[in-house]
C-alpha cells in the first residue's frame, strides 16, 4: 500500500521556544515545525506567518502577551501555504500583507493546498475545525513595501522565486534581523513541491547580500550569529542545488520519475537524511525537480488526489 502521507512518528509534541533577537524582534520556533516571527513596534505588533490554525495561533498570542500588551495590527504572509497562513483569523489584525504573486497563488491553488496539507500533516492542523476559510490579503505589493511601526522600519520584500513564486521576506534594516520564511530552512528539509529550483539560489543571494546578523528560517532554530546565518543559507542552497542536479541528469537521460526518485534518495540521504521531514519532502521535491528539468516552469497544482497518485507511483 502507499506509505501514509503523514510523516511517520509525526505526532510527537514539539517544544516551543520564544527567543528574543533584538529589542523589538522575536522568534517562535518549535523543533523543526513551522516558525512564526514577531516584530514589536512603538504602538503595534506585526506577526510573520500565523501557524496553521487559530487554536495554534493562540499559543503565539499567549507568548506575545508575556512581553507586550500592544495590539497586533499586521500579519505578513511569507507565502501562500496553508500551514503558514490559516491561523490568521486569531490575531484580529487590521491588515494581512502579502506579495501580489502570493495572492495570485491563493486564488489559483489555495483551496487545493489547504485540503492536501491537512491530509499530509494532521498534527500541524490541531483543531482544524477552527479555520474559518482561506486567508485573504488586504494589502498586496509587487516588489517591496516599507512599514513604520513608530520608529521601527520594516521592509517587506518579494525577493524572487524560490520556495514558491511569491516568496516574501521581512527585513529590519536597523537591527539587521531577517525573517526568511521557507526560503531558508535549518536542520529541516526544504519542501520544493511549488518551487523554482533554478531561481532559488539567486534569491538566496539577495538574502545574503543584506548581511543579516540574525535570521529566522521557515523551520529550525533561530540563527543568531553571522556564522549560523551563513550555515542556514549555505545548507539550504546545497540541498536545492544537489537535488536539482541529481534529478535533472536523470530526467535528461529519459529515466522515469521513479528512477529519478530512487537515485536522488540514494545521493542525498547520507548528507540530509537526518533533517526534519526528509522522507516526507523528497517525493514532492523530486516530482517538482523532474517537471522543472522537463521544462515545466509553472509548478503543477498539488491536490489530495495527486498526492496519493504520486506516492503510489514512487512506492511501486
Description of each model-found segment:
Residues 140-172:
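Core dinuclear metal-dependent hydrolase active-site scaffold
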